């Protein structure tokens, strides 16, 4: 039997599911989120309560640039095949986490924030060349 690893400090859903870490299935939360109909969901939890892991799970579920069915195999969300067909890997996702932005001073924290935003811009730079309709452009203006 394969030894499972503890995911201490690992907040990447794909890494946890692919590399044999223990994972407590919270994928049912996706269905609850979708059924709530809320325009905005605010997650207020203390540090180290899985907020970034939850965001990573959502990104992997919705991201149109990926096919992540294998990551969700055996999880609660896959029991709802209609929901998965309609929502899974069907939408563009921009993922930005500030979990690594901290510092011993304002200047240090600002430098980390600038670095994080710079990396974010590099990852999604290709979007500058995407053709958009006027209506689509109005959403981001």
Predicted regions and their residues:
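Phosphate-binding site recognition
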Residues: 1-141
């Amino acid at each position: 039997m394969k030894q499972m690893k503890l995911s201490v400090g690992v907040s990447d859903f794909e890494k946890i599911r692919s590399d044999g870490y223990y994972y407590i299935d919270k994928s049912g939360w996706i269905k609850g989120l979708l059924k709530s109909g809320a325009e905005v969901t605010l997650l207020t939890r203390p540090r180290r309560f899985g907020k970034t892991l939850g965001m990573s799970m959502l990104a992997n579920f919705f991201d149109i640039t990926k096919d992540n069915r294998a990551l969700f195999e055996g999880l609660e969300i896959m029991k709802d095949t209609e929901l998965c067909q309609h929502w899974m890997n069907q939408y563009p996702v921009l993922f930005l986490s500030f979990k690594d932005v901290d510092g011993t001073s304002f200047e240090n924290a600002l430098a980390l924030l600038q670095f994080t935003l710079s990396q974010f811009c590099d990852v999604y730079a290709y979007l500058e060349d995407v053709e958009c309709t006027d209506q689509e452009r109005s959403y981001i203006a």
